[in-house]
A protein has these predicted regions:
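Acidic, S/T/G-rich, low-cysteine, solvent-exposed domains in lumenal/extracellular/periplasmic regions
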Residues: 1-193
């Protein structure tokens, strides 16, 4: 980062996955995953909150809904923890892209720092967050919702471009030994979280 290398961060701050859901109970406990990146990203002006985005505009999953003879009947259900996000930004990185499927996405909070930030992708206006730790069950596909549940909660950033001169995480810290290659501040750079 200090030498000008561009960075793409694909970070899961919540431990949850579809493969874990396909167990005997169809339930998992979504919990925070500590990655030790919080301080660095906070210094650069963003915070990935340990929450899950639940969106009405989501991709379907197929679940067994019964049997017809010896054949298992499969039915598609909307899985609200897998938002299907259409880019609305005019930034060249996402301009003209089709919908993008996320699984167990976490919202990004934008903080006031010197680094320029551009929201590349955000959830729909019919989305909200679910705190962690929280049980997630396949039975949630049958939940009924109303637009009032999402009022004022949507449009959550899930991808952000940061541009500028990033300071080292170790700036103003005592180094264990003298390092002639240490840079307190980097060159103009970009990173996507």
């Amino acid at each position: 980062i200090m030498n000008g290398g561009k960075t793409l961060w694909l970070v899961d701050v919540v431990k949850a996955g579809m493969d874990s859901l396909y167990n005997e109970t169809g339930t998992i406990l979504a919990a925070q995953r500590e990655l030790n990146l919080t301080d660095m990203l906070f210094k650069y002006g963003i915070r990935i909150n340990p929450l899950l985005v639940k969106d009405e505009y989501a991709t379907p999953i197929k679940l067994a809904s019964g049997n017809q003879g010896s054949e298992t009947q499969m039915q598609e259900y909307t899985w609200k923890f897998s938002p299907f996000i259409y880019p609305t930004s005019t930034n060249p990185i996402v301009k003209n892209m089709e919908g993008i499927k996320f699984e167990f996405a976490s919202p990004i909070e934008i903080l006031k720092k010197d680094i320029k930030k551009t929201v590349l992708l955000s959830s729909s206006e019919y989305s909200k967050t679910v705190g962690t730790p929280s049980p997630i069950s396949l039975d949630m596909v049958t939940e009924e919702t109303t637009p009032e549940e999402y009022e004022g909660k949507g449009l959550l950033p899930v991808a952000v471009l940061m541009e500028g001169k990033f300071n080292s995480m170790y700036k103003n810290r005592v180094l264990p030994f003298k390092d002639n290659t240490f840079q307190a501040s980097g060159k103009d750079n970009k990173m996507i979280v």
